[in-house]
Design a protein with these regions (language model features):
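Terminal substrate-recognition subdomain of acyl/acetyltransferases
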Residues: 2-3, 133-138
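Active-site rim helix/loop that mediates acceptor-substrate recognition in acyltransferases
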Residues: 37-58, 63-64, 72, 120
Length: 152
């Protein structure tokens, strides 16, 4: 879809969190298979809370008052003191541990976390910030929204 006007970029608000979780779900839906819907929901929330703990900045792109893209950046391995997000992450981690499918998907999640740690510890590429998550809705891709989010 060709946009008639430029999208607006702003900091995220609490009302945007359900839509950000939906973007995370859409991003990983094609990569992981779920037999049960609650496993997909819990893993999505676990990823969301992990991102929110280690976030530095969360920016959303809006077009016609609709959120069409999100960028979550973080600095290193030092997260925010976010007790709410940490408690929710622990809760969903435990709920996933209780099911066979959840344990299988947690293995993939742990591999992702290990790769992320290796990239942040690497001395060859010291970066001031990391992109934790970047997503633009499929209908709005190829319009420079991702580039605009990165420039913010």
């Amino acid at each position: 879809m060709l946009l008639k006007k430029e999208p607006a970029y702003r900091k995220t608000e609490k009302e945007d969190f359900p839509l950000i979780r939906e973007f995370i779900r859409r991003n990983y839906k094609d990569r992981w298979e779920f037999e049960e819907a609650h496993t997909e929901k819990r893993l999505t929330r676990l990823l969301f809370y992990t991102y929110m703990i280690s976030r530095d900045k969360v920016t959303v792109a809006t077009y016609r008052d609709q959120v069409v893209g999100v960028l979550i950046t973080g600095k290193g391995s030092h997260g925010h003191f976010a007790p709410f997000f940490r408690l929710k992450k622990g809760y969903h981690f435990l709920r996933l541990k209780l099911t066979r499918e959840g344990r299988k998907n947690l293995e993939h999640f742990n591999k992702l976390q290990d790769m992320k740690k290796q990239l942040t510890v690497s001395q060859e590429n010291p970066a001031p910030g990391n992109i934790l998550f970047l997503y633009v809705s499929k209908d709005y891709r190829r319009n420079g929204i991702g580039t605009g989010l990165l420039k913010q």
